[in-house]
Amino acid sequence: MAKVAETPMMVQYHEIKSQYPDAFVFYRLGDFYELFEDDAVLGAKLLELTLTARNKNSENPVPMAGIPHHAAQNYIDILVDQGHKVAIVEQMEDPATAKGMVKRDVVQLITPGTKLNSGMGNDKQNNYLAAVLPRDNRYFLSYIDLSTGELKTTTLKRFSDVIDELSSLEVKEIVLLKDDETTELGIANKLAERGLVISTQSDVNVNATVSFLTQPLVHENEAQVTTILLNYIFDTQRRNLDHIIPAQNYERLAYLKFNQDTRTNLDLVKNARTKKKAGSLLGLIDETKTAMGGRLLKQWLLRPLRDTEDINERLDVIEAFQNEFFVRGALQDHLKSVYDLERLAARAAMGTMNARELVQLKRSLSAIPGMKSVLSSSQGILNHASQRLEDMSDLAGLIDEAIVDDPPISIREGDIINDGFDSKIDEYRNVLSQNQKWLAQLESDERAATGINSLKVKYNKNFGFFIEVSRANVSKLEEGRYERKQTLTNAERFVTPELKEHERLINEAQLKRTEREYELFITIRERVKANISRLQKLARQVAQLDVLASLADVADNNRFVRPTFTDDNIINIKQGRHPVVEAILEAGEFVANDVNLDQNTAMQLITGPNMAGKSTYMRELALIVILGQMGSFVPAESAVLPIFDQIFTRIGANDDMAMGQSTFMVEMAEANLALQEASAHSLILFDELGRGTATYDGMALAQAIIEYLDAHVHAKTLFSTHYHELTALADKHENIKNVHVGAVEDESGELHFLHQIQQGPADKSYGIHVAALAGLPDELIANATTILSGLENQEALVPEPKASGLSEQVALFNVSDVDPKTETLFQKLDSINISTMTPLEALNVLAELQKLRK
């Protein structure tokens, strides 16, 4: 865009903009933030602002759009939520006293990963910023929630692990080091393809603060990636960040591992269809009362434990809460009064906490003595929890003594400090409180002296104090004593020496009062800041109690039981239930099922009609495992479980078409991940693997995968299939057992699903019945029934296994005995691509198949 001859202000703007080319520059001009040039054009569109121009009459006017400074935060949030960055440029000196161009500078760069919440809401969502560093054929990851101070780091083997971890954390912005290795690996492009905002850091400095925050880290590359992240934060935030907690390393091996596909397949934190929390497992189990508790619950759900002792510690507290119903209820009543302590502490550290947030902090801290009292009335573990909670009544008392209960949002306009807290403020307030009395007396005296009964003493922001008389009475005023200040249509306004002096005293008292109140507010906020570590420790303890009490609520409300963990590698679940599906159905409608895989059973082959409940059965096992290992009770009458290290799933058809992958490719990729990564301590759930390709290929691959898992992996596996021929594998492999989902036909031929898992294979799949239930045309159903009858009358396609041939394989196919007509029919079936076929095309194909049969 062509530019006009630049004014000093625009020179200053362009210098700043050149440093932040990828950000919207909010340039402070008086009471407004201005956007210029391309920022103004795009900003006006995104924010629905009026687009104007600077130097409108010039050949090249400069586009501009303005935002009132008091409303800027709303507009900033809109831009950042859309993935943009915003550089805030403030006036660094008073324009009234500045010589020449007012100095301005960027005071903060707000990005998707550094956006802060106010701390006054009930936000149960973390906002993580991460850095990734590739070194030595591994990936080092560090992430931080700037709004809470949480800082963690880990080492990952593969880039796919990085993607899974970033997805689990719901990271929006990634910081990368500008170096050759990062560039050569194309990491920026790979991450950008997934919708992440990419930021880069060139300089990496290790100052005293960085050294302190990375000191706990042993691995050099973990310290380096954390240093990159911290440098980016310090460069963009330009403020005190004393709330950041020294970095903690974590090992993924310490937690039950599962990838994004599994999280999606199981609806763990969001419903796969609606993308909302409602309808997910998290939505069901979140009965937390605080924002910190909500965030911690989600972290526990996404990182179930593998240490039995740690799991049982959580279960012990839940059980104690179950046994102490009234204690739990009273505790939760107190928790409802607790605001977001983590984020309030962070805002105090960063110097952004206002007076209202101080009051929120006071109310939160004031709830702690009640919580301690309630817990101490119990015995054992809850009593011990009471002793760990720190009573911070000293800080709450200071805030209560100093700050009014309902302060204004602004901290610079006074009315924040309580009467009686400070003698100077009381003195100034006394002067101000006498103002109205003094003005009333002046008005009375002036009326008596002038004889003008309509004379009034008034005040407004533009002219201050003045005496107003009607124009008809101006002649009654004593000459030389009254100084004209303003002429109106029907009146004149004057000031007197006494009124001028009074205004000076009032303004001085007002100014000194607000300055003194601000000074005291900052002092109190600094006292809060000095207690950051105490507040953060207290916040963690309160969050844990909130989560455990919430899980006790969930257990009571949903008939969950405490699981038992064993080293015997068995799964023994009595009347297990899918908690989310059960919650949707009417009471008593959900059909519970046992899940039994003993030491001699590694795999269940599950057959039965579509819609009968195979997928639900598989999902409920995974959810019970995850709930149990996160330290929660589980939906069953009883549950004995091993400790799993990983869960692999292929359930549903969440095709990655956007990444150019078909259903079958996704199936094979997910199967390969399990084959390569699973151990004997893993859980594998494969739902109808092989359906995405031709029948023979799919069946052959399914059998090969089953036998590979049995021979080499030995993981506990649920494998559902519509290939009924595969059920013969149970006769060959002792660790494979057949089960099926029951269904019965009534006398009229109508199909009824029992939703019960029964021993042995299903006798048939009832696919045509399911098609009829789906509403396919009667003519089509009749044709399909005829075709099926004809196929079933043909010679068996899968004879009994023979000793000859594939000595270690179950012979699924013996096509040498198939007559030519049937072979032609098979070839035609193999050529059909049902995923792209329209209903009309399906009818035509069925008609053609019927002709081939005749």
From Swiss-Prot:
Q: Which family does it belong to?
A: Belongs to the DNA mismatch repair MutS family.
**Which InterPro entries does the record associate with it?**
DNA_mismatch_repair_MutS (IPR005748), DNA_mismatch_repair_MutS-lik_N (IPR007695), DNA_mismatch_repair_MutS/MSH (IPR017261), DNA_mismatch_repair_MutS_C (IPR000432), DNA_mismatch_repair_MutS_clamp (IPR007861), DNA_mismatch_repair_MutS_core (IPR007696), DNA_mismatch_repair_MutS_N (IPR016151), DNA_mismatch_repair_MutS_sf (IPR036187)
Question: Entry's Pfam families?
Answer: MutS_I (PF01624), MutS_II (PF05188), MutS_III (PF05192), MutS_IV (PF05190), MutS_V (PF00488)
Entry's Gene Ontology molecular function annotations: ATP binding; ATP-dependent DNA damage sensor activity; damaged DNA binding; mismatched DNA binding
Question: What are the alphabetically sorted keywords of the record?
Answer: ATP-binding, DNA damage, DNA repair, DNA-binding, Nucleotide-binding
Tell me the protein's name. Answer: DNA mismatch repair protein MutS
Q: Does the keyword DNA damage apply?
A: yes
Q: In this entry, which stretches build a coiled coil?
A: none
Q: Which GO terms describe its cellular component?
A: cytosol
**HAMAP family linked to this entry:** MutS
Which PROSITE patterns does this UniProt record tie to the protein? DNA_MISMATCH_REPAIR_2 (PS00486)
Q: Name one GO biological process term.
A: mismatch repair
Outline what the protein does. This protein is involved in the repair of mismatches in DNA. It is possible that it carries out the mismatch recognition step. This protein has a weak ATPase activity.
Q: Which residues bind ATP?
A: G608, P609, N610, M611, A612, G613, K614, S615
Q: Which gene encodes it?
A: mutS
